[in-house]
Each structure stands twice: as structure tokens, then as C-alpha cells.
Amino acid sequence: ALRSSGRLTFGIMICYDREFPESARILMLKGAEVILVPNDCGSMQPRLRALSTRAYENMVAVAMANPNGDNAGCSCAYSPICWDRNGKCVDNTVLLVDDKTEGIFYAEFDMEAIREYRNREMLGNTFRKVEAYSQLLSKEIKKPFIRDGQNR
């Protein structure tokens, strides 16, 4: 889903959507500058790294809200800015809460800096390799990825 406030365009993807890079890519292509992820499932480290990667590869800010407690927690926010103007890699973590802390958390994104970054850097929609997508569009599922009940 995509929503615009007039000053900012938000994309929204649910917790299961975050498992697939295509969800964030489609929201970016539709104009999202910030992707919000309401979530209610475990936020193990690979999932947190994936959200950071979604921010980086799509040049969008990403924020996930998750309840605390067993099999949950780790609300987080990531900026797409992974390089400073001198080419030095910077940590794009804006907010990362542990799995036990309960509360309301705020993540502040510098949208002016993000927009400027999007205008000069090479990711997002700048150099996508759409000619490679034909292989991704095949519905054929091969071993070892065949599962019972799978959509084919």
C-alpha cells in the first residue's frame, strides 16, 4: 500500500511482505520514500539485516514496529544512507530496540539528506538490471525448494 501526506510518501508492507525483496522494490518504484512495517513475529538478526538491506538497495527509509516479548521485539529503523560524502561506509541504523523493552519509540529521518542522497547515489531505480528479470518471472520451482502446499 502507498500513502502520501503531501510532504512524504509512505509505503506499507506487513510482516510477511518483508521476507521478500520484491515487496520493498515495488513500493520504491511506486514512489515510497519511507517504508513502514507493522510486524508481529520474531525479529531475529537475519530479518533485521534484511530490513537494513531493503533500505540500502532501494534508497528508502525503513521502520518496523514490533511488540516486545517472546518471539517478537526489536523495533527498528534504518536510513538508506550507507556512505558519507567522502565515500566512507556509515552505520545506517537509526533505531534498534531490544526484544524486552516496552514503550513508544521514535525514529527521526533527515528527509532532506535522504532525498539528496537519492539524487546522487547509484541504487534504487538508477541502474536496475531489468533484462535479468525474465529468469525471476519463471514459476518453475526446482529442488531443493519444492514444498507441500506450495503455490505453483
Model-assigned labels for residue ranges:
Residues 9, 18-106:
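CN hydrolase (nitrilase-like) catalytic-core segments centered on the catalytic cysteine
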Residues 2-4:
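Structural signature of eukaryotic scaffold interfaces centered on beta-propeller domains
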Residues 67-152:
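C-terminal beta-strand edge segments of enzyme domains
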